[in-house]
Amino acid sequence: MIQVLIDADNLSAPQLRALVAALPAGGMRIVVAGSPRALASVAWPPRATVIAVGGWQQADLRLAAAYRLTDEPLVLGSGDGDFSLLAVNHPGPVLVISDRPASRLRGAGTVTDPVTDGTAVLRRWLDEVAG
């Protein structure tokens, strides 16, 4: 099962919408955290766990707590360097969704911005890891 962690405060509304639109209907565990305003900008799939938070770093803390260490693929919807160690040490393939990822995230796996790059890279990566 592909693990998807999304920091709604770290991506723009168009990036969030493009990411959600590209995700397949099944085989995913989706957890999204962010401010109520950021969360309201997207129609989240019913299968997503949506966590509204307030305050600095609260979305990061909730997503870190939701992370599961498995060798299954990880999609990280954030360019925040706070997730660098998580992504670098993840034993499975990692896809980072961001237009300006922290330098350590760039070395963790594939990086794409579905707005600038289109969704082809994202969809191809998902197809490859799904086998």
Predicted feature descriptions by range:
Residues 1-29:
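N-terminal extension/subdomain marker
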Residues 29-131:
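Nuclease catalytic cores that cleave nucleic-acid phosphodiester bonds
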